[in-house]
Amino acid sequence: MNDASRSESVQTGTLATTTLGTSGIEVGTQGLGCMGMSEFYGATDLAEARATLDRALELGVTLFDTADVYGSGHNEEFLSDFVRANREHVVLATKFGIIRKADDPAYRGFDNSPEYIRAS
């Protein structure tokens, strides 16, 4: 999809839009949570996940949710190419502060320090 057709498809998406708070940023009324594209629900087909992102954008979804804890950073890395290719149409929501340990998948700690926020 080239930039011209991407702009046209986003503009003709079927979702209503809303403004995020007082920011003035317009987003589709439905967002896409991307957590399952990196873990929690079994093996991920990255080509299928990318096709899902592209189709969601075509339908007017402009808000995509991720977090550094999803796949221990994999989710944000995976989304980076999609966001870069569609930057003018995409609003990215993220979260931070949850710490996991590689040797203990059930462990959840918290770090809301300014240093962790900047690093995440």
Regions found by a protein language model. Give the residues of each.
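N-terminal binding-site loop/beta-alpha segment at the start of enzyme catalytic domains
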Residues: M1-T94, R100
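Glycine/proline-rich, positively charged
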Residues: E58, D104-S120
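Residue-level signal for alpha-helical context at structural boundaries
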Residues: F96-G97, F110
